[in-house]
UniProtKB/Swiss-Prot annotation:
It comes from Geobacter metallireducens (strain ATCC 53774 / DSM 7210 / GS-15). Disulfide bonds: none annotated. Belongs to the CheB family. This is Protein-glutamate methylesterase/protein-glutamine glutaminase 2. The keyword Phosphoprotein applies. Signal peptide: none annotated. One of its GO terms (biological process) is chemotaxis. NCBIfam families: PRK00742.1 (NF001965). Residues 169-356 form the CheB-type methylesterase domain. The lineage of its organism: Bacteria, Pseudomonadati, Thermodesulfobacteriota, Desulfuromonadia, Geobacterales.
Length: 360
């Protein structure tokens, strides 16, 4: 089997050594080279043509954003950003520019703790050969040519349904490639749907609040990071908090969020399966589950639960998925109602809701 060739770009000598040590412990990986600033980094990427680049965003001579634009424009290569939690807004900018994923340093200023992210970075590196680089390049070009407009100011969401709808909730799960995909779906609507949307995106603690705030600015929905006790109501989008699972329960005639610590068997967090299964239990046949891009099989048990409760399930098509792992496993269950390219998912949701909501 061909080994995964990686170039490590980081201005911290300790961080470079730590990342190289992690990578060299993987028999399927070879570190082809490293660089301590952006200018040297782009030369190494062009000369060595690696399968993957790990990238620090804050560097001398050429910052990570400039380097990322050059890589995606001249020698498209999968890039994993390694970032401090304090740089959360920068991470989402990097994902928009074409980075495929990110790994969070455990805490700012404690380089030694970088060693604790070994499992996370190794898992993401192993998925490099399953990445859909054509779709990553296409999305990056679309964002550069036509960045999403700022959504019109929204009125405060009210806990009531103002238009009849065949669904109560749309539950979306995703992993690698998910943040730009979710942004694309939500920003496609010109008006909020008369249903709730709940989202579990595999993401560490410390990043989901910024993700929710970003989506809130770029869509007509009220989007927030879910907190325990939040009410689920039409027009509201709730994002599972990083490092925790989001489930639901009925309380005094409403449905509320319960934020739970992950169980030992939860490999992926926040768990898409846990969210989908809870939606099936609470919302029953008025649930639509959507499994987007991502590695692994999270979501496959959840779509079975939704179908068992009489609900509906969609999966993202291979043509648009950055990683087809999660959608493939959902489709393999045999219960998915339709396989849909990313750019048509918002329209499909609207049709299944049964409301004539305008789309861009």
């Amino acid at each position: 089997m061909r080994k995964i060739r990686v170039v490590v770009i980081d201005d911290s000598a300790f961080n470079r050594r730590a990342i190289i040590k992690m990578l060299e412990s993987m028999p399927e990986v070879v570190v082809a080279g490293y660089a301590n600033d952006g200018e040297e980094g782009i030369r190494k990427v062009i000369d060595l043509k690696p399968d993957l680049v790990t990238l620090d965003l804050e560097m001398p001579k050429m910052d990570g954003f400039t380097l990322l634009r050059i890589i995606m424009g001249y020698c498209p290569t999968p890039v994993i950003v390694i970032s401090a939690k304090s740089d959360d807004e920068k991470v989402f900018k990097a994902l928009e520019l074409g980075a495929v994923d990110f790994v969070a340093k455990p805490s700012q200023g404690i380089s030694e703790e970088l060693l604790t992210i070994t499992d996370d970075i190794q898992q993401k590196v192993r998925g490099v050969f399953s990445l859909n680089m054509k779709e990553i390049i296409r999305r990056e070009k679309v964002e550069v040519l036509a960045p999403p407009p700022v959504a019109p100011k929204k009125a405060e969401a009210e806990p009531r349904r103002v238009v009849p709808c065949r669904l109560d909730v749309v539950a979306i799960g995703s992993s690698t490639g998910g943040p730009p995909a979710i942004q694309r779906i939500l920003s496609s609507f010109r008006e909020a749907l008369p249903l709730a949307i709940v989202i579990s995106q595999h993401m560490p603690a410390g990043f989901t609040r910024t993700f929710a705030e970003r989506l809130n600015r770029l869509s007509v929905f009220e989007v927030k990071e879910a907190a325990d006790g939040d009410t689920v109501w039409p027009g509201r989008v709730l994002i599972a908090p990083g490092g925790h699972n989001m489930v639901f329960e009925k309380s005094s005639g409403s449905v509320v969020v319960r934020v739970r610590k992950p169980s030992p068997e939860d490999r992926y967090i926040p768990s898409v399966d846990a969210m989908l299964a809870s939606c099936a239990e609470v919302f029953g046949p008025r649930t639509l589950g959507v499994v987007l891009t991502g590695m692994g099989n999270d979501g496959s048990r959840g779509v079975r639960a939704i179908k068992g409760a009489g609900g509906q399930a969609l999966a993202e098509a291979e043509s648009s998925a950055v990683v087809f792992g999660m959608p493939r496993e959902a489709i393999a269950t045999g219960v998915v109602d339709k396989v849909v390219p990313l750019d048509l998912i918002a329209r499909e949701i609207r049709m299944r809701c049964g409301v004539a909501t305008d789309l861009d």
